């Protein structure tokens, strides 16, 4: 069974259609990234996946035993005294083993904030703490809504590498919403382009050439993603498989820096 499977999901709010017949599957060790314009229903889709919103139609099956969630942001009232240590400890049912909080914060590059109050954290520090909190649960599925918001560029690369490592090295399934299209195209296994319905989905290279993707993001964005095209005698199927040109692999293409396949 997949870690997460959505089939034919429809959702309305206030008489407006938010999601229309959305299908999505997340398997162990796979990174699925949802992209789309503002108002496309991306965050709502994650909330349906988590069970925070009930769809009007369709099915949601969760095979994951433990889910780690990083929201787009979390606002904690300034009058609430809550230390980072306590905030992290609340994520797990039992008291964490000695040193585990420190290790997890160090992993996300935020070891220096353990003794501080949550309300005193910067936006980037808070996102790192939220990711640490999700990882403390030892999840088999990570659900991430813009996980690097407010983090500087160098820090973004570090956190995306960490997320990728969770999938590749530990078999964690990842469902992520991101506006960082360059990173998405480099690191993800499967892209879902959402605009209330699924406009297109598949391997990043395939999606980046799809007419509906181009219509949503424009040719300038598509041109800026040329770094992810390659100059070999093969192309890719929708699932990312390597195809000779004679089998529908498309035109010859060239690899850019950071490309992870040949």
Curated annotation (Swiss-Prot):
Belongs to the ABC transporter superfamily. Zinc importer (TC 3.A.1.15.5) family. The gene is znuC. Its main location: membrane. Keywords: ATP-binding, Cell inner membrane, Cell membrane, Ion transport, Membrane, Nucleotide-binding, Translocase, Transport, Zinc, Zinc transport. It comes from Paramagnetospirillum magneticum (strain ATCC 700264 / AMB-1) (Magnetospirillum magneticum). Its EC number is 7.2.2.20. It is found in: Cell inner membrane. The complex is composed of two ATP-binding proteins (ZnuC), two transmembrane proteins (ZnuB) and a solute-binding protein (ZnuA). The lineage of its organism: Bacteria, Pseudomonadati, Pseudomonadota, Alphaproteobacteria, Rhodospirillales. This is Zinc import ATP-binding protein ZnuC.
